[in-house]
Swiss-Prot record:
<dbReference type="GO" id="GO:0090729">
    <property type="term" value="F:toxin activity"/>
</dbReference>
<dbReference type="GO" id="GO:0004867">
    <property type="term" value="F:serine-type endopeptidase inhibitor activity"/>
</dbReference>
<feature type="signal peptide">
    <location>
        <begin position="1"/>
        <end position="27"/>
    </location>
</feature>
<feature type="propeptide">
    <location>
        <begin position="28"/>
        <end position="33"/>
    </location>
</feature>
<keyword id="KW-0732">Signal</keyword>
<dbReference type="GO" id="GO:0015459">
    <property type="term" value="F:potassium channel regulator activity"/>
</dbReference>
<dbReference type="InterPro" id="IPR002223">
    <property type="entry name" value="Kunitz_BPTI"/>
</dbReference>
<feature type="domain" description="BPTI/Kunitz inhibitor">
    <location>
        <begin position="37"/>
        <end position="85"/>
    </location>
</feature>
<dbReference type="InterPro" id="IPR050098">
    <property type="entry name" value="TFPI/VKTCI-like"/>
</dbReference>
<comment type="similarity">
    <text>Belongs to the venom Kunitz-type family. 03 (sub-Kunitz) subfamily.</text>
</comment>
<keyword id="KW-0646">Protease inhibitor</keyword>
<feature type="site" description="Reactive bond for chymotrypsin">
    <location>
        <begin position="47"/>
        <end position="48"/>
    </location>
</feature>
<feature type="disulfide bond">
    <location>
        <begin position="60"/>
        <end position="81"/>
    </location>
</feature>
<keyword id="KW-1015">Disulfide bond</keyword>
<dbReference type="GO" id="GO:0005615">
    <property type="term" value="C:extracellular space"/>
</dbReference>
<comment type="function">
    <text>Serine protease inhibitor that inhibits trypsin at a molar ratio of 1:1.</text>
</comment>
<feature type="disulfide bond">
    <location>
        <begin position="37"/>
        <end position="85"/>
    </location>
</feature>
Amino acid sequence: MGTARFLSAVLLLSVLLMVTFPALLSAEYHDGRVDICSLPPDSGDCLRFFEMWYFDGTTCTKFVYGGYGGNDNRFPTEKACMKRCAKA
């Protein structure tokens, strides 16, 4: 049972890295920090249905968020998204 549990943990870690690493590579960095507005939309890991907003590089667009996980390019309103991400 210990080997199966270990292999499950390794598989889970591998999947998480495959999902997270490309998103980090596509993000822009400013002062060594990730610019959250450049991250791709990420619906997260759960199956709930929350209408949220993400910045697509030009404007804020609706998407469905599952309620857990995802990244920080996620805002409760279009106004909050534009305030954080739109360049004046």
